[in-house]
């Protein structure tokens, strides 16, 4: 059985959590009232929502709604759960709480996480894949993949007027404005530009290098 939490899902704002969860359990085929009551208490407790069961869903915070979404995804004891952008828009406290919840669930259920937030991958995933245009480009353990880029990532500040030419002649992983200049990260076996320093690779480097189709042959 498959459980699914989409990035955006509708909740009836004037219905309380207990009522909607019971309704969803019925829709998923749990017809026995006693079984539904036990399941509802178990899953709402697991997601730390039991004490809020009588509150209307329209009063829930973004993180509480996400936790309710995970609870409903667990109805029916699924063996696989797909979670789409679960921490998008959450504040740091709720993101941390949600990470802990997913880690706990992942001990007993296979969780497939679809996300653009690199912290989700580094904190939660034992295995990862980077997909572009429907094709899997990279797959493996996050830390092992990052380790392959050790000594390959360089960083430095350049003038904005020089950036275009540098990007043309070097494998620029990513760039951002900093103090009126451009802070760039470059993929190279050797010091690409005088004054650049070697830096520890991050998952974000792997992601941008893959998406930007930089030459990773021999590195990954």
Residue ranges with predicted function:
Residues 98-185:
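ABC transporter nucleotide-binding domain
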Residues 56-60:
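Conserved ABC ATPase signature
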Residues 77:
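Conserved catalytic motifs of ABC-family nucleotide-binding domains
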Residues 70:
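Hydrophobic anchor residue at the start of the ABC signature
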Residues 81-84, 90:
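Catalytic Walker B motif of ABC-type/P-loop ATPase nucleotide-binding domains
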Residues 8, 14-27:
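Q-loop/switch helix immediately C-terminal to the Walker
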Residues 22, 26, 34-52:
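Conserved ABC ATPase "signature" region
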